[in-house]
Amino acid sequence: MRGGNGLQIHVVKQGDSLYSIASTYGTTYDAINVANELDNPNQLVVGQSLVIPIVGQFYFVQPGDSLYSISQRFGVNVQELAEINNISQNQPLEVGFRLYIPEIPEPTIEVNAYVEPTGNTVSETLENSAQKNAPYLTYLAPFNYRITREGELIAPPLNNFASIAANNNATLMLVVTNLEEGAFSAELGRIILTNETIQNNLLNNIIETAQQIGFRDVHFDFEFLPPENREDYNNFLRKAKERLSTAGLLMSTALAPKTSATQEGEWYEAHDYAAHGEIADFVVLMTYEWGYSGGPAMAVSPINPVRDVVEYALTEMPSEKIMLGQNLYGYDWTLPYVAGGEYAKALSPQQAIILARDENVAIEYDQEAQAPFFFYTDDEGNRHEVWFEDARSIQAKFDLIKELKLRGISYWKLGLAFPQNWLLLEDNFTIRKRG
């Protein structure tokens, strides 16, 4: 399976070893091991997807393929494809024949990643994750500055985030929320959006904080607002945009994943896609949590529902304002699902693969959702269902970004190990740096 230009995605089959895979692609054991950060390279999991670092990429001919159809798929001139593979343009291709696909130009996108410290400190693991992945980021977004009911700001621990961003030419994003006592507060949102004095105090504090610390984008993540405050939110954003632009700051917003302007539900109704698309410099669509910790087991960000949200957004705003939200986590559900019962446990893609290996189960792949999953039984006899992300699922999102010419991608959140994502991101795109 193709990745971008210089990576191939290989799904481990029964009998595969890292040595045999390396031989197939003309690379080395060490190169694959390092790229995928394998903790036990001699114990692969059937169904595990690996990224294979090569220059250009290989494609294995499928039934019904012709050289012309393959050249169209990859955007490569058919004559160039024939010449580089030493074959005739009109030569019938055998199924399984390996073609070399030369590199093609990469689209340029922006990349954001939220980073969420817990408690009053930034863990060493989280800071290391920010340091490691900042080269791939346009924006680094510490989550979050909470608002008081008087319009003051309560800062998160920042540690070295500002210097990490500066040293990697990434823009620091100031994330402002209506979180109160650990949950999004409709009442706090109502107070802020209906009181001009508090709004003015809040905007003064935001601008002062941004200038002191070096934030260059202000990102409003106001959720679960009262539906009757929809237009109040729009008016607040208009005022904020004017103030922030005068101060030389960008402004962005986070939007619940809607598929129509009239979608009902407390998460959706106060979010006006058309207004945000008009006012903000860009938006982040929160296109994840179809599978969530308190719900039934399913893919966290299945490709078709994600596409539905983006296609609706495109009817309300230009593609160059849309950042696709992407989870860096999966969930482990205990079966059977019972409403109000035990919450699913979050885990990283790397943790999911290790869990499948330890439980000696194969990883399956849902072609419709474009997501990997597996089942296992724990030591107490409880059945589990795990959905997560892998190289194939993230490549499907990258292909959607390219197809719909979106501004970029926004990750929730750093600190979850998924090395294949960052390699494929760099392989598929040129990442814009704002400096």
Regions found by a protein language model. Give the residues of each.
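Glycan-recognition patch characteristic of GH18 chitinases/ENGases
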Residues: 104-201
